[in-house]
């Protein structure tokens, strides 16, 4: 950082910890690559399309990130985040002791006024730093300008913007029909309100959020805008902008390659929303395949998990393939991390969080589940894993996705709690899992029905069960915030991870073979230490790899934990290619991959722990008989002697003389090698053992010798200390003590793990057999009366009585009319609603 930047940093308010930085990133939905460089207080104003300055202004903080400028108002609903590359011009309008006013113009024609609430000197320094950032991003400005032109908001506000080249720029729904009937949902009225909003407060990359933005999202997004607003509210729009060529690149680079994930994807393609027309032909199936395949290569640690196909298939109805790909990444990384990992640890953590919330908020219902042995997680897990797309009719599930991307994962918990709350009386009658499933299935299929059939008040009588669900979720359970969910996730994290790891441990230990005389306790201790060594780069519960292996340096660390002779190694000892540990590692590596699996390690230790002197002598001999010809040459004998000295360096000086005697006897009894490398004659052991003094045969210093296994065995057995070492001392030096115990696991999780985590067939049946609660209506199909998701209590106006195919394809929607505004009357967040 330059000296100027350092000076400014001392004067401006910056995040003082990584925790605060992560909160800022989440607030603006930015990637981990973004760092908050500077911030300062300011006041934000707007200059509208008619060049009139908006009388309203918003106080807050202005942030400079690595690639973005952002604003967060004192009122949480007021904010913006836009890339530097969308900014065409920044100029100082006026400057005095009270304010330093900047004018910011974007490449798509919007202008904003920012009043810096700092001294003139600080403002000047800030402007210089902003200028440096803009200059450094200048090369990408044209790309951002072209990027913004693809959005429907551009065409809605600027009729001269040409149609996008991609035929599915607004998802499959534009051609195959959207699940939401545009006439019933008053599509054109909503488009008019969004058009007015875009003209006032900017669009796509340059959009400013005010309180009206969230309200427009909550009353249901128009079909053609849904994908764009999902991208904006989730932050995947920024991710796609920064990696605009990645999706096509992945499909091209990995074309023709195979993996286990691809095999699983193929199994599920035909089971992904099969009732939707686009997935009844190859076009839709190919698009879904492309998204899932690209995602599996992009996130190879995750690959593919069942239920991802349901989510991706639903997103494609409103989004392009590329949009869906980046939305999936954002969902998996930021919104519900760990849901689609190999162990589904994120789902299991959230199930614990959900059950704890139920216990606190609805104790009677929780007690009923416990008394009747009803496993709530068996019912709720598919809700969370499929984002309710697997259980609700699509029009309602899409409404929940609108809230989900806007508000974050807390929406899943709020809706989950509201479902139980609104059905508590019926649920209390359930005595087993199947009854609960039946009750909720009937509920989901009737979400379009009136909630208060006997009400005399017209407005109350018009409220549907789905509207009531939203009111319950966002009012009754408004205390469920993003911070609360994050804190609860942290609270349950270790317990869930330990449970998963304990389950995985039991499963893997049962599959081990060739463990000789090792006990179950020994295997357990080896497993624990093995994964303890690997914990710095991998944790079993995260499921990031199915084949974790020890490299050589990690193997040395492992042995240091179970033997005295492997402790205190320096870099030279570890890097010595001729060391005993290197020979031992190569011996353990049966598959010759350069790393050790748990099975390799167990089999190797079982050999070392076998208390048989003849077998142990053969083991050491084979370590140094590299070519497997049954003989050791002179350098090999010296290496064995060095290994014995190294192994016994903590056992006493008497081994020095024993090793010296070992060398002498090996040389004494060895045969000189013939030209073909084999000894000429066998040694007559009885004659040599009786020879003394000058009768002993000496091998020349430069002679090639060969020591056979029988000779090696005879020499070792003739030296008492070495016989003791090989008969039991080596085995006893390996102490398989337990690793320090982890904290106890969460009580009710083991049953869930037993039935769900490993039992993939059961999960597969849940999603592969997916049928919606009721078939969704499409723009070119028949509407189902139970899938109506209107949220207005007024009747459809004459302006909306146009054919569905016309109302949904005509982009010239006109200006907002008075009747449009009654859409805003019902808002589940308002305090005075029923």
Swiss-Prot record:
Biased amino acid composition, Low complexity: 782-802
Keyword Cytoplasm among record annotations: yes
Keywords, comma-separated and alphabetical: Calcium, Cytoplasm, GTPase activation, Metal-binding, Repeat
Residues engaged in binding Ca(2+) 2: 625, 627, 629, 636
Residue ranges, annotated region (Disordered): 766-834
Cysteine disulfide links: none
SUPFAM superfamilies found in the cross-reference section: EF-hand, Ypt/Rab-GAP domain of gyp1p
GO CC terms of this entry: cell division site; cytosol
Signal sequence annotation: none
Domain Rab-GAP TBC: 220-408
Gene3D superfamilies, per the entry: EF-hand, putative rabgap domain of human tbc1 domain family member 14 like domains, Ypt/Rab-GAP domain of gyp1p, domain 3
Subcellular location: Cytoplasm
Start-end of Basic and acidic residues biased regions: 818-834
Record function comment: May act as a GTPase-activating protein for Rab family protein(s).
Ranges for domain EF-hand: 576-611, 612-647
GO BP annotations listed: vesicle-mediated transport
Residues that bind Ca(2+) 1: 589, 591, 593, 595, 600
Keyword Repeat: yes
Annotated protein name in UniProt: TBC domain-containing protein C215.01
GO molecular function, one term: calcium ion binding
